[in-house]
Regions:
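N-terminal helix-rich structural modules
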Residues: 2-168
Length: 168
């Protein structure tokens, strides 16, 4: 693919636009160099999980649950709720959690809590067991307030003047 036909701009959602980059010369690397790049990319995924976890107590749990819904073939992808959840998940991926990557305010989901409860309850049992819950109801009791209640974790970092930075 020539440089002139390569599309650097990719997907756009919410207030974000994804950019793509060319890895010039990647094809010329030796097999051992390509393996090294592969294992570095695997390490970045672990680092991403660490960052996501550090940005909020429930961020990994939320991301893994949203990913399970996103990849479940039984979920109807044509609904407005699914499309809203897809944008929310992409924002979670980009920001490593449920708060804006620089504004630190919590994302407002564009899918209903009723829909979310229904699709999570319909997931295979091993999905919620893998994240440490014995039932979908127990998982939803933790997730729904964090995702849907604007008073729960409204900001990742509060730097407002006069506010107790530790307590808030």
């Amino acid at each position: 693919m020539s440089d002139s036909s390569f599309a650097y701009t990719d997907e756009r959602f919410a207030d974000l636009q994804m950019l793509r980059y060319r890895l010039a010369g990647f094809g010329n690397l030796s097999l051992s160099q390509k393996k090294y790049v592969f294992f570095l990319s695997k390490a970045t995924l672990v680092g991403r999980d660490i960052t996501t976890d550090q940005f909020g107590e429930f961020n990994l749990l939320i991301r893994k649950t949203l990913e399970a819904v996103y990849t479940d073939e039984a979920v109807d992808r044509t609904t407005a709720d699914f499309k809203g959840m897809e944008v929310y998940l992409k924002r979670v991926w980009f920001s490593n959690g449920i708060h804006h990557h620089y504004g630190c305010e919590k994302f407002v989901p564009e899918f209903s809590e009723a829909w979310f409860r229904k699709v999570v309850a319909a997931l295979p049992r091993d999905v919620w067991e893998r994240v440490g819950y014995t039932s979908a109801d127990a998982l939803l009791a933790v997730l729904c307030p964090v995702i849907f209640d604007p008073a729960v974790q409204p900001k990742r970092v509060n730097q407002a003047a006069g506010e107790d930075l530790v307590a808030t």
